[in-house]
Amino acid sequence: MTIVLNPKKPLSVNPLKMSQPLGASLAFLGLKGMMPLFHGAQGCTAFAKVVLVRHFRESIPLSTTAMTEVSTILGGQDHVEQAILTIVDKNKPEIIGLLTTGLTETRGDDMEGILKDIRQKHPQLKNLPIVFVSTPDYKGSLQDGYAATVEQIVATDYNAFIAENARSAVIYPQPQVTVLAGSSLSPGDIQEIKSIIEAFGLMPLVIPDLSRSLDGHLEDGYQSITGGGTTLPQLRSLPHSCYTLAIGESMRGAAEILKDRFGTNYEVFPRLAGLEAVDTFLWRLSQIVTSRCDHHFPIVPNIPALFERQRRQLQDAILDTHFYFGGKKVALALEPDLLHQTAWLLTEMGAKIQAAVTTTKSPLLEDLPVDTVTIGDLEDLEDLSAGVDLIITNSHGTAMAQRLNAPLYRMGYPVFDQLGNGQRCLVGYRGTIQFLFDVGNILLAEEANHNHQLSVGVHVT
């Protein structure tokens, strides 16, 4: 069992973690017609917007209640009310995601009571879903805020907000499965998961669906709210799902809520990268098709041939790359779900995890292929990473990698010095292949550079 270390440092040096409000806004951005609303100072929203814009290189719709020193002392109900009314008037959202920040959490605003009063005061808000989530940024991390938001999304009764001429629910002829997509998944990852599920004749209902909002596509015109994502009719069809697939341990809580509300059985998949992990996922899908759902149409009883070929391609990629992974020392600094997936995949390839640093507590931390994992910052990682062959973390690790004279593979949030983050896919057979080739090429280049330096040294001598 891995020992989890949580040193009591008086400050964070070269921070690793992103805040809960950032994670919450990311989850909200996976819903169509959404406007995330930060209840806090303007700077809180500006920070999240800058991080997300730099990472995805897309327009990010965020709004704020713009709390000031005076309103923080006297109370922020008027600011929340005015912000909601302004958003409704100017942006015409289908849904609003209201999240708190450290400022308003410290004050202790009664947000449920505030929303109730606002609805009573303004009947025009009767049919507008407003999903509230508590996300203090002085504790937890991006993954915590994201998970809490998904839990609130699936806990909300959207049938209570049906306007005239609105669609109550989407009913598909195929069996529907709910997919709870964790914060470790990129829009490209989610698209790959959807394609895999659809190949089995199932209809995936992804929450939140970033593959429809932050995948990097041109809209016909300017969008002041999210132009894609999980729709309200899809959210109303949650009771019709025959199974829930939770991708990432952090999605277990949301899966439990769906089971309690609708009796939908679920399974948690801690990772979807690596031969064994993807095999397990595909096997479960085949079992859902053949035994879990009511089906009245031709179905695919076994694993589609497409994935048999992809599996063989992954086996070949493993053979091609394992020479460069074997015995390599790797340092990781990632959110828990992503750390677990990456650490096990590297270990399966023969690499050794020399250092592991993460942002928050998780049951997965006790099941890592490493003796200890530290809940800390990038300074902790640097102290543990002397002599490593590879560092995997976000773009904030660039200077550290240069000081350690080790290559950096960018992963997590934010990645602001690399293009294509919205399309990047590292799950499934194809995503695993891409990861192995990406990292393998880095290690191959380092080995070639090292051999060149040795040959130059011998020649000079």
UniProtKB/Swiss-Prot annotation:
Pfam families: Oxidored_nitro. Pathway: Cofactor biosynthesis; Fe-Mo cofactor biosynthesis. The keyword Cytoplasm does not apply. PANTHER family: LIGHT-INDEPENDENT PROTOCHLOROPHYLLIDE REDUCTASE SUBUNIT B. GO terms for molecular function: nitrogenase activity. It comes from the Bacteria. InterPro entries: ChlB/BchB/BchZ (IPR050152), Nase/OxRdtase_comp1 (IPR000510), Nase_comp1_CS (IPR000318), Nase_Mo-Fe_CF (IPR005975). This protein may play a role in the biosynthesis of the prosthetic group of nitrogenase (FeMo cofactor). One of its GO terms (biological process) is nitrogen fixation. This is Nitrogenase iron-molybdenum cofactor biosynthesis protein NifN. The keyword Ion transport does not apply. It comes from Rippkaea orientalis (strain PCC 8801 / RF-1). Keywords: Nitrogen fixation. The gene is nifN. Belongs to the NifD/NifK/NifE/NifN family. The lineage of its organism: Bacteria, Bacillati, Cyanobacteriota, Cyanophyceae, Oscillatoriophycideae.
